[in-house]
């Protein structure tokens, strides 16, 4: 992925330079595979848990994956963490989407506004996981409301947002996406979950539903 300015919002100044071991651009490139893997395993988890109550999205079911790749494993690990986030806060994701009623025309605007609010007070792994979770929910919501083939666009939303809002740089400074493989242990995970989704029922709803 080119490092120059492309479509989307101007890139923010991100402070410290990225570590040479995992460049910002490499993280942005890896994000696509991480998100695809995350989506596949999250969708699989819901299918197994809910059965016919959770209609399958054919695009998610047939995603091309490399399960043994490092980025594939990262996506799976984040899906496990995301499953915990979803169990605790799914009703707030659903309420948000029902109120906003995203379409192909306005989905990028809504995604960007909500994602920007998520990281307004800083970046941490919990918020990164919540961002992937919201991208998944957005893609599934749009599919369930009659628009097929939208997952690729949501993937691009996630990649572009991470690159233009310093998140790819932040991940690179921590060694790249591979660092996420060490997140799933007890107290650390609980802290990340709380920090990652605390705004969903408060800040986002207040800003977008009451404006």
From Swiss-Prot:
Compartments it resides in: Mitochondrion outer membrane
Disordered: annotated span: 1-28
Tissue expression notes: Expressed in a wide variety of tissues, with highest levels in the heart and skeletal muscle.
Short motif BH1, span: 117-136
Binding residues annotated for Zn(2+), in chain numbering: 160, 164
Annotated motif BH3, positions: 74-88
Cellular component terms per the entry's GO annotation: BAK complex; Bcl-2 family protein complex; cytosol; endoplasmic reticulum; mitochondrial outer membrane; mitochondrion; pore complex
Intervals of motif BH2: 169-184
Any one GO BP annotation for this protein: limb morphogenesis
Swiss-Prot/TrEMBL domain comment: Intact BH3 motif is required by BIK, BID, BAK, BAD and BAX for their pro-apoptotic activity and for their interaction with anti-apoptotic members of the Bcl-2 family.
Subunit-level organization: Homodimer. Formation of the homodimer is zinc-dependent. Forms heterodimers with BCL2 and BCL2L1 isoform Bcl-X(L). Forms heterooligomers with BAX. Interacts with BCL2A1. Interacts with RTL10/BOP. Interacts with VDAC1. Interacts with GIMAP3/IAN4 and GIMAP5/IAN5. (Microbial infection) Interacts with vaccinia virus protein F1.
Family: Belongs to the Bcl-2 family.
Protein name (Swiss-Prot/TrEMBL): Bcl-2 homologous antagonist/killer
Native source organism of the sequence: Homo sapiens
């Amino acid at each position: 992925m080119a490092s120059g300015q492309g479509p989307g919002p101007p890139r923010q100044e991100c402070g410290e330079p990225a570590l040479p071991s995992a460049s910002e651009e490499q993280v942005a490139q890896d994000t696509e595979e991480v998100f695809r893997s995350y989506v596949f395993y999250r969708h699989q988890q819901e299918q197994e848990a809910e059965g016919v109550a959770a209609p399958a999205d054919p695009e998610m079911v047939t995603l091309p994956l490399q399960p043994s790749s490092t980025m594939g494993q990262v996506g799976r690990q984040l899906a496990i963490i995301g499953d915990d986030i979803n169990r605790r806060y799914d009703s707030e994701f659903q309420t948000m989407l029902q109120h906003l009623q995203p379409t192909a025309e306005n989905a990028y605007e809504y995604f960007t506004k909500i994602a920007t609010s998520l990281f307004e007070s800083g970046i941490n792994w919990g918020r990164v996981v919540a961002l992937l979770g919201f991208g998944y929910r957005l893609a599934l919501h749009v599919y369930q409301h009659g628009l097929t083939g939208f997952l690729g666009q949501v993937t691009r939303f996630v990649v572009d947002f991470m690159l233009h809002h310093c998140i790819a740089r932040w991940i690179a400074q921590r060694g790249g996406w591979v660092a996420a493989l060490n997140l799933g242990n007890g107290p650390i995970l609980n802290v990340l979950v709380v920090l990652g989704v605390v705004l969903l029922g408060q800040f986002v709803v207040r800003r977008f539903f009451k404006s």
